Design a protein with these regions (language model features):
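Phosphate-binding/switch region of NTP-binding enzymes
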Residues: 155-156, 161-184
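Glycine-rich P-loop/Walker A and Walker A-like loops and their local beta1-loop-alpha1 context
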Residues: 1-61
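Short glycine-/polar-rich loops that comprise or flank the Walker A/P-loop
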Residues: 15-17, 42-44, 68-70, 154-155, ...
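Substrate-engagement module of ASCE P-loop NTPases
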Residues: 139-165
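Nucleotide-state-sensitive switch-loop elements of NTP-binding domains
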Residues: 6-7, 65-98
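Short, aromatic/basic amphipathic alpha-helical patches
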Residues: 58-67, 169-176
Length: 184
């Protein structure tokens, strides 16, 4: 049974989970930062998969909110697609495109294995962007695969999706793969 709630406080105290966070566009940035800050402030290291914003932009945004990025490994799947300059970074893996689900999967595996602690998170931003590059059925299969991997890795898994009418059926289907659904 999926726990439903309207606050990220529903995640506090849970050791491992797969959470689907459905966010209004106006709260998207602040919600993402709030979730990450909460995890990092609990001394939980993790992986941030970005399909929306380049690594440098995310780092700058996090620094402005005093989020310690030393505990985060980034996977950036947008900088190359947007034609940005790629410089080798010790805390970031660059992927060619949000369309390349195999590369995203391999990178997540590598990044999670790099974190030596038992307690860790994987933050996937965002399902909505994945749908711009991939068919709905492909995305549903990928999220099913991803939720399974999150359970195998025993992480705190968060999958972000924008609240959009056209994604309603998919969100309902994906709820079955998750432990918690947050309406934010």
């Amino acid at each position: 049974m999926v726990k439903k709630g309207s606050s990220i406080s529903k995640l506090k105290g849970l050791k491992e989970y797969v959470a689907l966070a459905v966010v209004n566009a106006g709260k998207y940035k602040s919600t993402n930062m709030s979730i990450i800050k909460n995890l990092v402030d609990q001394d939980t290291p993790g992986v941030y998969v970005s399909l929306n914003l380049p690594y440098n932009t995310i780092k700058k945004n996090f620094s402005a909110k005093k989020i310690d990025t030393s505990k985060i490994i980034f996977i950036d799947a947008i900088t190359k697609t947007a034609g940005g300059k790629i410089e080798k970074k010790k805390d970031c893996l660059f992927i060619g495109s949000p369309k390349n689900l195999s590369d995203i999967s391999v990178s997540m595996d590598q990044a999670i294995m790099e974190i030596p602690t038992k307690d860790k998170f994987l933050f996937f931003d965002s399902l909505s962007t994945l749908l711009l590059y991939n068919d709905v059925k492909v995305v549903a299969k990928f999220v099913h695969f991803l939720s399974g991997k999150m359970r195998v890795w025993k992480v705190k898994g968060i999958i972000i999706s924008l609240r959009r009418k056209e994604d309603k059926d998919l969100i309902e289907e994906l709820e079955t793969f998750c432990d918690v659904k947050l309406d934010l």
